[in-house]
Amino acid sequence: MPRSLKKSFFVDRHLLKKVEKSAENNKDKKPIRTWSRRSTIFPEMIGLTIAIHNGRLHVPVFISDEMVSHKLGEFAPTRTYRGHVAADRKAKKR
């Protein structure tokens, strides 16, 4: 058995407390704001909306069952891809 299977998943304590508190208050549907991109998604988070910080703003992500055992940071991209710059058409005509 590999070492990684022996160890449990990593979740920051403050995020774990917020998830437990939100599970108690089912009527409270506000997203949980977090800066912890390194935390692993565990089954108690399913159905919650978590706002993950991407370096500039908090990106709201609805947690589904397919996301379990992934990291929160995977769902809040930090870089924006604007595409390659198109060549100047006037320069090509000359």
Swiss-Prot record:
Database matches in InterPro entries: Ribosomal_uS19, Ribosomal_uS19_bac-type, Ribosomal_uS19_CS, Ribosomal_uS19_SF
Gene Ontology cellular component annotations, sorted alphabetically: cytoplasm; small ribosomal subunit
Originating organism: Hamiltonella defensa subsp. Acyrthosiphon pisum (strain 5AT)
BP-aspect Gene Ontology terms: ribosomal small subunit assembly; translation
GO molecular-function term, one example from the UniProt record: rRNA binding
Chain's role: Protein S19 forms a complex with S13 that binds strongly to the 16S ribosomal RNA.
PROSITE patterns for the chain: RIBOSOMAL_S19
Protein name: Small ribosomal subunit protein uS19
Alphabetical UniProt keywords: Ribonucleoprotein, Ribosomal protein, RNA-binding, rRNA-binding
SUPFAM superfamilies for the chain: Ribosomal protein S19
UniProt key word RNA-binding: yes
Family: Belongs to the universal ribosomal protein uS19 family.
Domain of life: Bacteria
